[in-house]
Structure formats: structure tokens, C-alpha cells
UniProtKB/Swiss-Prot annotation:
The gene is trhO. This is tRNA uridine(34) hydroxylase. Belongs to the TrhO family. Keywords: Oxidoreductase, tRNA processing. The active site is at C180. The keyword Oxidoreductase applies. Coiled coil: none annotated. The lineage of its organism: Bacteria, Bacillati, Cyanobacteriota, Cyanophyceae, Nostocales. It is an enzyme of class 1 (oxidoreductase). Pfam families: Rhodanese, UPF0176_N.
Length: 309
């Protein structure tokens, strides 16, 4: 990796009351643009959620700018690197929620489960009395998860409450441990679980990314790669880039075996979308792929890239 061109990728979030969040949008965007930062930051009444990339100095400046607000002075972030810019532009968006559960009454600023550090995580999820739940979407779980974790098979985080109502019982499932990419979804999920009467609710502090950063492979209970919402697509231990790519048609992460399938055609289809392609859709996709190649873009422009939502 060329150290001079190395991009620092910083991911952060914090649940904190920000009643003036809309007023922060334009100044924050202007500051990020002045620092040549790219990525996405979400602002809502319940807090902030973002992933940004840029030079070492620019990232440090933006994080200092954010922490100059006393409500964000203890804002934690996770870092990784990329050898090319992982985002095309800078966006600061106003949202109802910084991660969309669809239940405004669930407020992590009021109550959350117990934080578990990466060093404590293995012991917790090895307890046979603990049910371990991956709160991410099915396409993320598909490429990697923790040993023994339950996959709710959700298409979006909004589906998680229904999964809980249909499959979990506070009287039967006494201890619940949850995890997600960076910690934000499992933190909000823990608040929801407590509101549903679950007594012992735990969540992985810093998420999978912090675990992969701190826990050596020989001690790890993680299996596979971790999907990330930028053009690296996936990372492994040490937060090094993984091997997955995105299907240009449906956006599903693809492993090498997916690309070896007879149902895979670059830019057109993969095993996850092949059966849903009518002849008309295939023709439109072929034209879309042709136009993409003509533009010689360096970005997939896929809707899955940005921040976890």
C-alpha cells in the first residue's frame, strides 16, 4: 500500500440527544468539504452516525471538529485504511433515526443492554445459556458471522422487531448477546429487547470491526469476512480488505465460488439474482452494464454503500 496515498477510513456513531441536529448539517458539510473528506454522515434527534475517508490530517481535523460539541466530546471511532478513496462524494443527511428500526419510541438514550468488550466476547458467546443473534441483514450474514450465531434472515433492520416477536421469548431466552458491524444496530436492538421484557441483554462494544481489529485470528470465533458499507466490500482480521465483490445487478456480496457459478455473468447476473431476471430485465441490465463500462467509472454506485441503516 502506498503510504502517501493511504486513505484513513473512520467509522463512528453516538446515541445522544441532538434537538438542534438540523442546524448542524450545513456547517458540518462545509467543514468536511474544506478538508477534502468524502463519505456519509447521518444526523438525527437521537444522535450521529457516519463513515468518512480522507488523509490522516483531514480525518483528525473532522473528528476534532465533531468533538468540539460537548455532547460529542467522547465520540469514539474505529479506523481502517484503503489504498484508493472508498467514497465518491461527501453527504450529510438529516434522518428520523441514525439507524432505522422504525420504532420511534425505542430510545437508546434512555436504556441499552450491557456492553461487552471484544476481549470478553468469546467467553460470553461460548456460554450454552446465551443465545447469540446477528442483527445484520441476511446478505451481510451470508459472507461471515460468529460461530453459533442465529441469523434472523432480515432484509432490513426494520424487520428485526418482528423476528424477535415471532422467535424469542423473555421467559425462555434469559440471556441474549447481539452484535453487528460497528455496534450501532445491536445497541439499538438491545434497547428494543429491554422494552420487550428481556432481562439480560448484551451487545458487542465496537461491533465486529473492533473485534477483528483487536482479537488475533488464532483466538477468534469469527468465521468468514465482514461486510462493510464502502467500496472495500468486506474486511478480515486486522481490518485488511477481504475478497468479496458486489454483484453489479443486485448488489449481493459475491465470493469466488459465486463467480465460478454458471449463473454468474459479470455485470448481468449472479446466483442470487439469476432466477429473478426476465428476458426484458436482462436486456436492460446488459445496457446498464454497457453504459457503466463506457463511463469507465471506478465506483459501483451501489445502494448498499454508505453507512449501516
Amino acid at each position: 500500500m502506498n503510504q502517501e496515498n493511504t486513505q484513513i477510513v473512520a467509522a463512528f456513531y453516538k446515541f445522544v440527544s441532538l434537538p438542534d441536529f438540523a442546524e448542524k448539517q450545513e456547517p458540518l458539510l462545509a467543514y468536511c468539504l474544506a478538508q477534502n473528506i468524502k463519505g456519509t454522515i447521518l444526523l438525527a434527534k437521537e444522535g450521529i452516525n457516519g463513515t468518512i475517508a480522507g488523509s490522516r490530517l483531514s480525518i483528525d481535523n473532522v473528528l476534532s471538529y465533531l468533538r468540539s460539541d460537548l455532547r460529542l466530546q467522547d465520540l469514539e471511532h474505529k479506523e481502517s485504511t484503503a489504498d484508493t478513496p472508498p467514497f465518491e462524494r461527501m453527504k450529510v443527511r438529516l434522518k428520523k433515526e441514525i439507524v432505522t428500526l422504525g420504532l420511534p419510541e425505542v430510545d437508546p438514550n434512555e436504556q441499552v443492554g450491557a456492553y461487552v468488550t471484544p476481549e470478553e466476547w468469546n467467553e460470553l458467546i461460548s456460554d450454552p445459556e446465551v443465545i447469540v443473534i446477528d442483527t445484520r441483514n441476511d446478505y451481510e450474514v451470508h459472507i461471515g458471522t460468529f460461530q453459533g450465531a442465529q441469523n434472523p434472515q432480515t432484509n432490513s433492520f426494520r424487520d428485526f422487531p418482528e423476528y424477535v416477536r415471532q422467535n424469542l421469548d423473555p421467559n425462555q431466552h434469559k440471556k441474549v448477546a447481539m452484535f453487528c458491524t460497528g455496534g450501532i444496530r445491536c445497541e439499538k436492538a438491545s434497547s428494543f429487547m429491554l422494552s420487550q421484557g428481556f432481562a439480560e441483554v448484551y451487545h458487542l462494544k465496537g461491533g465486529i470491526l473492533k473485534y477483528l481489529e483487536q482479537i488475533p485470528p488464532e483466538e477468534s470465533l469469527w468465521q468468514g469476512e465482514c461486510f462493510v458499507f464502502d467500496e472495500r466490500i468486506a474486511v478480515v482480521h486486522g481490518l485488511e480488505p477481504g475478497t468479496h465483490e458486489l454483484c453489479f445487478c443486485c448488489g449481493h456480496p459475491l465470493a469466488e465460488e459465486d463467480k465460478a457459478s454458471l449463473q454468474y455473468e459479470e455485470g448481468i447476473s449472479c446466483p442470487h439474482c439469476f432466477d429473478s431476471l426476465t428476458e426484458d430485465k436482462r436486456m436492460r441490465q446488459q445496457e446498464k452494464w454497457r453504459q457503466y463500462q463506457l463511463k469507465n467509472s471506478h465506483s459501483l454506485g451501489n445502494s448498499k454503500l454508505g453507512v449501516a441503516d
